[in-house]
Amino acid sequence: IYCQFKADNVNRTGLNSEPIKPYANYFVPNRGYQDTFADWDAKVKGAYPLQAYTPHYMRRAHTCYDNMTWTQEAFRNPVFMNAQDAEERGIEAGDTVVCYNDFGRMLRIAQPLQGMMPGTVGIPHGVRSLFDESDPAGIVDRGGSEQMLSDGQQSNYFPQVDGYNSLLIEIEKYDGEALVEDCDRGPFLAAGIDAEGTP
């Protein structure tokens, strides 16, 4: 339905309890764009100025197939961000970065892009967590799972979905040990399987 004439014709049938409109309703989302600002009217950004979403990625289908060395070699485990946002943070392509908010911290390889909208971040969905607990006060996921950045709050405009596409975060260049390429790290093995002799 893209015009009032069509909406009027559909509404004459009386099939819907609410009238259909030729335009979408707008819901202010939980942790949406407005929440990236400390002061919306003055347009002053807050502590977590970047809005992240979690697209599917060529390397895997959720966590399935993410254990294959060939695809790990072909496709890194990036975080896509706007090139200007990266430059303002001193981040270059290939840098290990920490993505964080009040819920957790995880590491990824930065991939700045000119085509990303400023203030947005793409964190491809579906990696396996690899926790670094060497600092109990600052546990970080070296696997790079986006779930570290969410408390599981459901979307208020589509209640069947967790809010993984409304993550408010900040990204900084990581000053710790750089990430090892996934293909060099070795596969994740099921419990009880010995890594010795595993290709």
What are these regions, as identified by a protein language model?
Residues 1-69:
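Long, low-complexity segments enriched in small/aliphatic residues
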Residues 63-65, 69-80, 84-199:
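Long, contiguous, secondary-structure-rich segments that constitute the structural scaffold
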